[in-house]
From Swiss-Prot:
Enzyme Commission no: 2.4.2.7
Ligase keyword on record: no
PANTHER family tied to this protein: ADENINE PHOSPHORIBOSYLTRANSFERASE (PTHR32315:SF3)
GO term, biological process aspect, one: AMP salvage
Protein name: Adenine phosphoribosyltransferase
């Protein structure tokens, strides 16, 4: 299935000069959504845990984990997860950000696939990898709906490791 048919361009969103890749048509089409989850599940069969960032990583990671009967671990911004959390700060172009996971859900030695909607610059994904590795997880794969190739996120992620990155669609 050609998933590009279900991803539309929205000019100047969320700000002027940005060409936003809108996945709403894919989510609104049951066959395209099912195909996407099925393909992601094929790619994630060989890991112990699925991890996804808020919010759109939840859209693809949770149903993939459920399909495979594997756990799904949320990565969120501060103040969004109850209980004890582990935090990782990372730099953005203009400032920094923090990501968190709940303590105790990742076990040392578990293999992980990170599932998200888009790979752009790779900064968020790189921070998630570091957060997981600091907990003893082995990040094997990053599975994405789409990759914005010109933003070089793949190069940022793979320059320090040999994590497999798989994108269902590349722009």
């Amino acid at each position: 299935m050609d998933l590009k048919k279900y991803i539309r361009d929205i000019e100047n969103f969320p700000k002027t000069g940005i060409m936003f890749k809108d996945i709403s048509p894919l989510l609104a089409n049951g066959k395209a959504l099912n195909y996407t989850i099925t393909e992601m599940a094929k790619l994630a069969q060989d890991v112990d845990v699925i991890v996804g960032p808020d919010a759109r990583g939840f859209l693809f990671g949770t149903p993939t984990a459920a399909f495979l009967k594997k756990p799904f671990i949320m990565v969120r911004k501060p103040g969004k997860l109850p209980g004890d959390v582990i935090s990782k700060s990372y730099d953005l172009e203009y400032g920094n950000n923090v990501l968190q996971i709940q303590k105790g859900f990742i076990k040392k030695g578990q293999t992980v696939a990170i599932i998200d909607d888009v790979l752009a610059t790779g900064g968020t994904t790189k921070a998630i990898i570091k957060l997981l590795e600091e907990q003893g997880a082995i990040v094997k794969k990053v599975i994405l709906l789409l990759e914005l190739v010109d933003l070089n996120g793949r190069q940022l992620i793979t320059k320090d490791n040999d994590i497999e990155i798989v994108s269902l669609v590349k722009f």
